[in-house]
Each structure stands twice: as C-alpha cells, then as structure tokens.
C-alpha cells in the first residue's frame, strides 16, 4: 500500500479518459472544456507531515492549493468554482472531496504500477487520468 510520500513529486499526464464528460457534469462551459482537453498538465504533489500542496501546471493555466490533511478549506478550482474541500489519505490513496452549491465531487489519487492514477467522480460520471513520474 502506498504512502503519501510515494505520491510526492512531479507527474506528467499521459492518458485521459472521460475528462470532457466529467467537466460537463461539473458545469464547465464548452470553451473551457476544449482548453482543458488540450492541456497536458504536470501535477506536483508535496507533503510535509499533514501539510499537503498540489500544484497543476500547464501551458494554459497553473493552479495550486495547500491544506492540512483532514481539515476542510475553501478551494478555488481551475474552472473558478469555490468549493469546501477536505483531503484525506485513506487506504493508500489521497482522497479530495469537494462540495459546492449542493453538489459534490471526489478526486482520488493513487499509485498503480508506478503511475499516478487520478479518478474524478461526480454523480455517475467517472474520469480517469494517468500520470507518469518525471525524473
């Protein structure tokens, strides 16, 4: 089972399935969805004890949030939503749960075969994004 430290580092997107459908379910407009589909972001994860930072960098946009594991905080997402978010490390996975306007979404990050697998779920829509470690 992975530790949060094993998720640390710079990861580059190499495969994505269902991202447009997931963004549509979030309520993201067509222009932002098209830009999001073209982006091949790097995800940089750092953790110092219970303090977590996740930065997403692409040529289009860079977003970042920092939090304490287990504590709710306000996150501004890449598409501009303000969410009440909590991150926990459970069963070898980093689970980010977002709530806003009576809606919710869960983003789970875990290691599988040396790759970072990110699963985004809202309602019955699931998106899977695969990242490889950048050395």
UniProtKB/Swiss-Prot annotation:
What organism, scientifically named, is this protein from? Homo sapiens
Q: Which residues bind hexadecanoate?
A: 131
The Phosphotyrosine modification is found at 131
- Residues bearing the modification N-acetylalanine: 2
- Where does the UniProt entry say this protein principally localizes? cytoplasm
N6-acetyllysine modification, residue list:
17
Q: In which tissues is it expressed?
A: Keratinocytes; highly expressed in psoriatic skin. Expressed in brain gray matter.
Subunit description:
Monomer. Homodimer.
Q: Name one GO molecular function term.
A: lipid binding
Q: Which UniProt keywords apply?
A: Acetylation, Cytoplasm, Disulfide bond, Lipid transport, Lipid-binding, Nucleus, Phosphoprotein, Secreted, Synapse, Transport
UniProt-listed SUPFAM superfamilies = Lipocalins
Q: What function does the entry list?
A: Intracellular carrier for long-chain fatty acids and related active lipids, such as endocannabinoids, that regulate the metabolism and actions of the ligands they bind. In addition to the cytosolic transport, selectively delivers specific fatty acids from the cytosol to the nucleus, wherein they activate nuclear receptors. Delivers retinoic acid to the nuclear receptor peroxisome proliferator-activated receptor delta; which promotes proliferation and survival. May also serve as a synaptic carrier of endocannabinoid at central synapses and thus controls retrograde endocannabinoid signaling.
Q: Which consequence is recorded for altering residue 34 to A?
A: Loss of ligand-induced nuclear import
| Stated name of the protein | Fatty acid-binding protein 5
Under the heading PANTHER family, the entry gives: FATTY ACID BINDING PROTEIN (PTHR11955)
Superkingdom as given in the UniProt entry: Eukaryota
- Similarity comment: family membership: Belongs to the calycin superfamily. Fatty-acid binding protein (FABP) family.
